[in-house]
């Protein structure tokens, strides 16, 4: 699929990995819709760093836990920027949820943002993709789906569901739309998790380091440029999955 001047929606593009993905898509010639929920300042910083700035790219706010907000987000994006050809489901939340103290609210929050939202985003954009005969969806999953972290079970469960959703969407949307997932290991940890100990994840990997945003961006670019890969989960975890 030719990427030049096509529209890409990147969720959670105001910070960290989403910001880096948006920057790379713009470098590939795409027009980027930068979604954010709370990170308005980061979203503005993202668009200011893209070629063409706000004259070429779009910033939109939405709470992806609400399906009505998803429909409004996609509708506004396509009205202002044009048909969405690429969807990057990057927005997610991640925090400790010890088994015996996890609340219903925490469970519902993580499953809604990390699994429900990617489903309804894909549902909303994919019909147009199929009718136009092309489209690409990339879901950010996680290396923990195979070996869940016991203190993050709702998060790991949501990402395991997203793996299944990725493969199911690839089947449902073929042959016009390619759907793949990227499973990062420990990559670009959030500042508010500075006190968390990620040394075990590093030790139980082959490359013995935390990944960078660039490591994931390269995987995104590969999946966008390839027209013969679908239904695949690409591990980018420093070899943790085979340690």
Task: Show where each model-derived region lies.
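Substrate-binding pocket helix/loop in short-chain dehydrogenase/reductase
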Residues: 98-99, 106-111, 137, 201
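Conserved glycine-rich cofactor-binding loop
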Residues: 7, 14-15
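Alpha-helical segment proximal to the catalytic Tyr-Lys
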Residues: 127, 170-175
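Conserved Rossmann-fold SDR core element
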Residues: 25, 163, 173-187, 229-236
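C-terminal substrate-recognition "lid" of short-chain dehydrogenase/reductases
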Residues: 212-236, 241
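Active-site helix of classical SDR
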Residues: 122, 158, 166
């Amino acid at each position: 699929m030719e990427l030049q001047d096509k529209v890409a929606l990147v969720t959670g593009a105001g910070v960290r990995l989403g910001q880096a993905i948006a920057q790379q898509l713009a470098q590939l010639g795409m027009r980027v819709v930068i979604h954010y929920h709370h990170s308005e300042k980061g979203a503005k910083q993202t668009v200011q760093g893209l070629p063409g700035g706000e004259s070429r790219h779009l910033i939109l706010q939405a709470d992806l836990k609400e399906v009505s907000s998803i429909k409004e987000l996609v509708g506004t994006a396509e009205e202002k920027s044009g048909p969405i050809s690429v969807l990057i489901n990057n927005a997610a939340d991640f925090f400790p949820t010890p088994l015996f103290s996890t609340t219903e609210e925490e469970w519902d929050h993580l499953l809604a943002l990390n699994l429900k939202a990617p489903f309804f985003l894909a549902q909303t954009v994919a019909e147009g993709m199929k009718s136009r005969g092309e489209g690409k969806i990339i879901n950010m999953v996680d290396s923990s789906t195979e070996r869940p972290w016991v203190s993050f079970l709702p998060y790991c469960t949501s990402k395991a569901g997203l793996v299944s959703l990725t493969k199911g969407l690839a089947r449902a949307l073929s042959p016009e739309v390619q759907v793949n997932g990227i499973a990062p290991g420990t990559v670009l940890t959030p500042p508010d998790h500075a006190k968390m100990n990620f040394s075990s994840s590093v030790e139980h990997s082959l490359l013995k380091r935390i990944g960078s945003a660039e490591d994931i961006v390269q995987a995104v670019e590969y999946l966008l440029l390839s027209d013969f890969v679908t239904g695949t989960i690409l591990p980018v975890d420093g070899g943790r999955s085979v340690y």
